[in-house]
Amino acid sequence: MKKKIHPMSLDILATCSCGNSLKIKSTIKKDILLDVCNKCHPFYTGTQKKLNIGGRVSKFKKRFDNIVYKK
């Protein structure tokens, strides 16, 4: 294998908008800012909101619920 062709892997600090900081390895040479992390993302915190608004199927059923089919 060729030597010295791989980029240097450095420890950098990734800071989230919520204030949480993570020390990670990366090939970039500067610290990064994250929008979300595992401390503030709704999936990981369990604070997801599921909106149950009428979709296409419920609109279809509501529209054609009163129709009587003749044989």
UniProtKB/Swiss-Prot annotation:
Residues annotated for Zn(2+) binding in this entry: C16, C18, C37, C40
Cofactor comment: Binds 1 zinc ion per subunit.
One GO term of the biological process aspect: translation
Domain of life: Bacteria
Matches recorded under PANTHER family: 50S RIBOSOMAL PROTEIN L31, CHLOROPLASTIC, LARGE RIBOSOMAL SUBUNIT PROTEIN BL31A
Protein family (similarity comment): Belongs to the bacterial ribosomal protein bL31 family. Type A subfamily.
Known role: Binds the 23S rRNA.
Protein name: Large ribosomal subunit protein bL31
